């Protein structure tokens, strides 16, 4: 193993009008409990607040984010229907975080995880020795309907000065056009095809056992999946269900994630999260 087990999260790029949510606390607490981290870093522009924040803050190194990173240009949202939809739904913070995570890991190395990650098992030390590690996600259909490989950026491990991350960051800055993932997941897959030796790819099960679709969200929040062998963490795809008004994937929403639901619930997320509340 090269380097320390440092974990990085990005949050609070927009003003925080609501208290820090239990889902986000679970991401940090499950990391603390399962990963034996040398440090957990939270990178934020606006510091979170609330009871769950007060409970986890002593275990974190908090870093303030300044100006938007190079390459993140909100003016590009106007160039496409998809980009305008991203801006309209307020998902621009996710794009800024796409650039920040690459800069953070390029400079310091370690592991990055989205703050809607629920850790299940310790990430092996060997993963930290690779130049860069990503997990595959379900393939994405191109304009011609042909499925193309995609590598999700919700969990990334990398060494400081990673060659792959440097190439990815350059590509992201060139290709960002306001659409959801051309600069991120799709760009990573393109670069992997060009230079497969620079990247260690894990099967989707490691980080993305349940996909960003109706069946995947049902398996996470309505059903019980005990077949978690080989699963290191669960990505919860929070943007697809967080708002109670969004029901195209599920009627589950953030307001339903409470200590009581975790204590008594039978769904996969409740069962995995339950020990962390103890």
Give a label for each model feature.
Residues 1-97, 115-278:
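Glycosyltransferase-associated regions of secretory-pathway enzymes
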Residues 98-110:
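Small-residue hinge/turn detector
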